[in-house]
Amino acid sequence: DPTQPPWGEAEHKEWQARRMEVYAAQIDRMDQGIGRIIDSLEKTGQLENTLIMFLADNGGCAEEIGEAWSKNVVGSISRRETRDGQPVQHGNDPNVMPGPEETYQSYGVPWANVSNTPFREYKHWVHEGGISTPFIAHWPEGIGDRGALRRQAAQLPDVMATCLEVAGVEYPQEREGNAVQALEGFSMMPIFSDRAHAREVLYWEHEGNCAVRKEQWKLVCKYPGDWELYDIVADRTELNDLSAEHPQIVAALGALYAAWAERCKVMDWSELQEMRRKEREG
């Protein structure tokens, strides 16, 4: 991110370092919790035949917590008070060191930039920095290769399809007389044995930011901009926009995206914003 200065030029270094320290401590806590689950599975003899899938749902989050942000989330994803009734101070204020229970901050743009390097953008957008995450699968009785790397692409809907295949159950077509939305995911079981994935095309949409990927080509839009085209194999960091050179590929991928958006009932972001505006105005 060219807007972010190098560490030598950064302001409030002590506060910035503390933000990452708190983030790292949260990761450590999560790791300890996962470790307790694994220990329990091992003690009960279930670890070898339990499929564990670990992944993030998006790239690094560059959201800075300010007053307006806090008003929208306090009471929903954060607490107004600590467990002993003390008020929680929300907001990324360099004069307040994060960490204690009575503070609520984020690690912000600088550390999200570190997390996502070398990819572009962050959570919310669908360039690689917003969507590319690691995925770990552990299942000793079901996955032959241990510690092996796989390079086939998959995405979140494939987790559901994988669970269905592992459990040996069919995805329902209706529930209580109502049709169920068709399953969009494809099982990742072939990937576990290093075979080709059934998924040929990947799709994304988040608040108007759109993308579709097929083979080496990725078509992506940063709302409200135009489509950009990248050879994601040769240019994973999305620096060389080839849309002007390959208009036929842009058209073909754009048609795939439009069909997917219609099938999955993706609302046009501009229309959705206008609908919300009218609702607010009564």
Please describe what each predicted stretch is.
Residues 53:
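Conserved catalytic/binding loops enriched for acidic/polar residues
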Residues 24-27, 31-38, 42, 116, ...:
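Non-transmembrane alpha-helical segments in soluble domains
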Residues 1-20, 138-144:
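Short glycine/proline-rich turn/loop motifs
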Residues 17, 21-28, 150-154, 182, ...:
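Soluble non-cytosolic domains of exported or imported proteins
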